[in-house]
């Protein structure tokens, strides 16, 4: 059984799995591993680590900015694999890489899956990979023990949802809106009906929902018909604000991020950042 499967199996009654997204190299390369450990301590059931890319089509402005900043620091795909290796020294929490197919194809599909697995990656999420064109990646991922997650959206047909469920391993990622990450949930009043409908067609995998979740209440409301939720832009925004505030110490920044993760999972109050001691 994979680490991700074990995580889902270990959830308590009515407990929702929480996945948290961070971009590798953001806000700077030295901060990524400590941030990963902070959200791990805060209760992340699994982590998505973004592979920086110059044209992240599905991402809203926060994650676009994070990716651009990471690239400005010179972060490469091999660097991201080294980040995973460093994280793995102290954690067994499932970690999936999220990004786009071009860098993976450039690296070499089998070589990438091999090196990712050796680094300690548990799975891949590639939003621009159509399931009908995924044979090579499906085969390579399976050969190296990696999960391969596919996405659905409110405009995904029933037949395509079935295909996604057949192709996916790990879970199916239901984006809550047809748009960019970080979009406002209030702009999609039919999201509840969409997730109830998707639940009827996703039979082989857990169903998780993401895009637009900013608070614990958002997460609980949106995940009523799913097995869990994923938060990205809200976490990126908080990290960005903390690292741009010169009054915050590194310890306080990490403690605040850990507290935000705990809030998303269990509803504890969001911690108030403390300034550097005078």
Curated annotation (Swiss-Prot):
Pfam family name, one: Trp_syntA
Catalytic activity: (1S,2R)-1-C-(indol-3-yl)glycerol 3-phosphate + L-serine = D-glyceraldehyde 3-phosphate + L-tryptophan + H2O
Record bears the keyword Amino-acid biosynthesis: yes
Pathway: Amino-acid biosynthesis; L-tryptophan biosynthesis; L-tryptophan from chorismate: step 5/5
Active site, UniProt feature: 48, 59
Enzyme Commission designation: 4.2.1.20
Domain of life: Bacteria
CDD domains membership: Tryptophan_synthase_alpha (cd04724)
EC top class named in words: lyase
A GO term from the CC aspect: cytosol
Signal peptide coordinates: none
GO molecular function: tryptophan synthase activity
This protein's UniProt keywords: Amino-acid biosynthesis, Aromatic amino acid biosynthesis, Lyase, Tryptophan biosynthesis
Protein purpose: The alpha subunit is responsible for the aldol cleavage of indoleglycerol phosphate to indole and glyceraldehyde 3-phosphate.
Assembly: Tetramer of two alpha and two beta chains.
Family under the similarity heading: Belongs to the TrpA family.
NCBIfam families: trpA
The protein's name in its UniProt record: Tryptophan synthase alpha chain
Lineage: Bacteria, Pseudomonadati, Rhodothermota, Rhodothermia, Rhodothermales
